[in-house]
Amino acid sequence: MALKATNFFTEPEYKLQDDLILDIRDLHVSFKVKDGIMQAVRGVDLKVKKGSIVGIVGESGSGKSVCVKSIIGFNDGAKTTAKLMNFKNIDISKMKKHQWQYYRGTYVSYISQDPLFSLNPTMTIGRQVKEAIYVSCKRRYYQTKSDLKYDLQTERIDLDTYKEKLAQAKETYKAKTTKAAVHAKTLEILNFIGIDQAEKRLKAFPSEFSGGMRQRIVIAIAVATEPDLIIADEPTTALDVTIQAKALNLIKQLRDLLNITIIFISHNISLIANFCDFVYVMYAGRLVEKGLVEEIFTNPVHPYTWALMASIPEGTDKNAPLTSIPGYIPNMLSPPKGDAFAARNQFALAIDFEHQPPFFDVTETHKAATWLLHPQAPKVEMPADVKEKIAITRKALAIKMPSQPVKQPKSNGNKKTKTKSAR
């Protein structure tokens, strides 16, 4: 079916800071199910800098995937609201179906958990990569035509400028979509991601590759469209440890080479520690802690982050049982009052069961939503097993723990609290 030129994207009232590519504020996503309304995401704020790798970590069911799928319109049947959803000064909260068609795979690419379900089993990998290149070029060309037409109609440009820029866009489109150009780019990408004998393997089908190689092909398709942002939704879950490391290293190389921004989703906190620049910790549809990777993994302050750190298998005595977080994520049909983690938190205070904590500042970039950071809260010692895991992480990150205690945090809220322990 021929692609149809879209209207221009809606521009948000708020313009992004120069260093940001994405700014989301107060995001809520819910689903109507048989038993009621499932509140998957509850008031999430995300800021993503250009060229960064941002990690979102949490247990399965925390709302990580639902949160990022709202960025690409993949939450079918969901009710999505936000005060702001700004991607490259495009208001994605007002996107229509035909606009999503241009946006996905052109500006944003998505890498899913299982490559087997991302690839068409009836098409060769060469054809699939080439199709991604061709379609993205065509979409960008038609979008440019639409934008130029709008600029002409609104007198942002004159007729001569319109004709000149349109001719340039057409020339670029033709040059990039010749058979030779698309073939050459496909080979270049496959060679870079480590597909041996790329020319020969162009005619191979997905079933002829291992799981690790299939995931590399999915990554190739994702970068072939030259997106500004790649969302990697637990892309290494189905891979063994050795292949995981290779896949992550490949994604990082592509980020450095192409200056692509990456949002990386995982329930594996050790992967996040070794891969990301900035980290959001998510639980029961809310963010509970956020900060630079070295801040989160050398000075975590939220009990949920402590629990995730303690569950890292690295450094655990081979004869000792693995640590797990007791209890379960609450039923999001009726989220609990107060802090959703309180029932599983051995350090919970009485107020945790009554009021949702605001974010407290640990540093300018490190914040956490826990009443333990309130000036009147009792002092709580970080668990010994968490300290052990921090020591391991510190070595991996090649940085040192702060030698001085953290300054007394400042609250973003004015609520007074009772600090009596509930335990």
From Swiss-Prot:
It catalyses: a [peptide](out) + ATP + H2O = a [peptide](in) + ADP + phosphate + H(+). One of its GO terms (biological process) is peptide transport. ATP binds at residues 58-65. Residues 398-423 are annotated as: Disordered. Its EC number is 7.4.2.6. It is an enzyme of class 7 (translocase). The keyword Protein biosynthesis does not apply. It is a peripheral membrane protein. GO terms for cellular component: plasma membrane. Residues 24-309 form the ABC transporter domain. It is found in: Cell membrane. GO terms for molecular function: ATP binding; ATP hydrolysis activity. InterPro entries: AAA+_ATPase, ABC_Ni/Peptide_Import, ABC_transporter-like_ATP-bd, ABC_transporter-like_CS, Oligopep_ABC_C, P-loop_NTPase. Keywords: ATP-binding, Cell membrane, Membrane, Nucleotide-binding, Peptide transport, Protein transport, Translocase, Transport. Residues 413-423 have a biased composition (Basic residues). Belongs to the ABC transporter superfamily. Part of the ABC transporter complex OppABCDF involved in the uptake of oligopeptides. Probably responsible for energy coupling to the transport system. The complex is composed of two ATP-binding proteins (OppD and OppF), two transmembrane proteins (OppB and OppC) and a solute-binding protein (OppA). This is Oligopeptide transport ATP-binding protein OppD. The gene is oppD.
